[in-house]
Amino acid sequence: GSVFNCGETCVLGTCYTPGCTCNTYRVCTKD
């Protein structure tokens, strides 16, 4: 959607917050 910072880092490439994905900056964002 609009990029929303989930407040979660994803060093291992996994986001635990529902609907969030790991971007190239290793930060979880929601679409």
Curated annotation (Swiss-Prot):
Instruction: Kindly list the residue ranges recorded as spanning the membrane.
Output: none
Q: List the disulfide bonds.
A: C6-C20, C10-C22, C15-C28
Q: Mind telling me which Pfam families this protein's record contains?
A: Cyclotide
Record cross-link Cyclopeptide (Gly-Asp), residues:
G1-D31
SUPFAM superfamilies from the UniProt entry: Cyclotides
Alphabetical UniProt keywords: Disulfide bond, Knottin, Plant defense
Post-translational modification remark = This peptide occurs in both cyclic and linear forms.
Q: What is known of its domains?
A: The presence of a 'disulfide through disulfide knot' structurally defines this protein as a knottin.
Provide the function of this protein.
Probably participates in a plant defense mechanism.
The molecule here is called Kalata-B9
